[in-house]
Amino acid sequence: MSVLNTFLVIVALILCYVNDFPVTGHEVQLPPGTKFFCQECQMTAVIHVLKHRGCKPKAIPSFACIGKCTSYVQVSGSKIWQMERTCNCCQESGEREATVVLFCPDAQNEEKRFRKVSTKAPLQCMCRPCGSIEESSIIPQEVAGYSEEGPLYNHFRKSL
């Protein structure tokens, strides 16, 4: 069993709404005043399309973790010269594995006409930390060159 050279296409609904109408897709441009929200992180039924070169694609029902989680940056309550950061992502909590057989009509020998591939799906979904952020990897806007472009440019006092 192998997932080598196997491609996985996920067909899923993105659980977001614009003015109470469901929308799908990854990118939405919104006019000012538009109400936009996405559902919390949850396990969602999807269709996985398993593909392997020389084999017929096979659509299988599965699950994916889809939804929003809270992330923020704010001034520290105890040390106002520091920022507190938290980044949470909708991720799996445990996984299940399944073996699927793909039909490969162009295979040279009879043995390889049916290829076993492994696929995985989440058992549960939850908001979990995305990963740690090293303080040294965060570049202040002034260093990155964005400070004069932002809406807060004149809000903060410049230090000499």
From Swiss-Prot:
* Database matches in InterPro entries: Cys_knot_C, Cystine-knot_cytokine, DAN
Quote the subcellular location field of this record: Secreted
Superkingdom is Eukaryota
* Main localisation: secreted
Keywords, A to Z, come to:
Disulfide bond, Hormone, Secreted, Signal
Q: How does it assemble?
A: Heterodimer of burs and pburs.
**What does it do?**
Final heterodimeric neurohormone released at the end of the molting cycle, involved in the sclerotization (tanning) of the insect cuticle, melanization and wing spreading.
Protein name, as recorded:
Bursicon
Q: What is the lineage of its organism?
A: Eukaryota, Metazoa, Ecdysozoa, Arthropoda, Hexapoda
Name of encoding gene:
burs
